[in-house]
């Protein structure tokens, strides 16, 4: 069996090189993931995305841009987004004895964060972000840590649904 699936590749710098352009033209390339090393300014990011789409309109432009410590673009008009754990912490904060208010506020905040994250990326030409993280935080992984909403799967799934 010979399965050929498209790859998402990366580039080194702020602009496309001749080698990058050749790789992006390859039919087995499905998209590109951007990192902090590809960021200089909002104008530069917008130009880079336009250059990528000029090569092939069907290429997906992705980024791991979650908020908190995993936010690739942090200046020049990008909002500093909270770590997902902050949204999870809102879940249990019922104000003035109103049961369920914390859940509602957490879901509303997750929806607002998701909208803002997507709008800012889309305005520059980025197609999607690899967020949210759906890992459960049992306190055993510093890699996951505050990137996770919570340790409760129900809470994680509802907040993730709200964010998306």
Question: Can you say where each PLM-predicted feature lies in the sequence?
Answer:
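N-terminal glycine-rich anion-binding loops that anchor highly charged ligand groups
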Residues: 15-29, 33
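Boundary/entry segment of secreted carbohydrate-active catalytic domains
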Residues: 1-16
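Metal-dependent enolase-superfamily TIM-barrel catalytic cores that perform enediolate-based chemistry
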Residues: 158-162
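N-proximal short alpha-helices
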Residues: 5, 18, 129-132
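Enzymes and membrane/adaptor proteins characterized by extended Gly/Ser/Thr/Asp/Glu-rich
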Residues: 28-156
């Amino acid at each position: 069996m010979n399965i050929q699936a498209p790859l998402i590749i990366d580039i080194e710098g702020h602009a496309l090189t001749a080698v990058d352009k050749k790789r992006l033209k390859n039919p087995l390339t499905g998209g590109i993931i951007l990192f902090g090393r590809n960021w200089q300014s909002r104008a530069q990011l917008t130009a880079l995305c336009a250059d990528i789409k000029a090569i092939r309109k069907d290429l997906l432009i992705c980024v791991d841009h979650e908020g908190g410590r995993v936010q690739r673009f942090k200046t020049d008009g990008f909002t500093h987004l909270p770590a997902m754990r902050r949204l999870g912490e809102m879940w249990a904060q019922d104000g003035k004895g109103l049961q369920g208010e914390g859940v509602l506020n957490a879901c509303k905040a997750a929806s607002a964060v998701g909208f803002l994250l997507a709008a800012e990326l889309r305005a520059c030409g980025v197609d999607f972000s690899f967020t949210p993280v759906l890992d459960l935080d049992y306190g055993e992984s510093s890699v996951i840590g505050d990137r996770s909403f919570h340790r409760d799967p129900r809470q994680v799934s509802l907040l993730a649904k709200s964010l998306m």
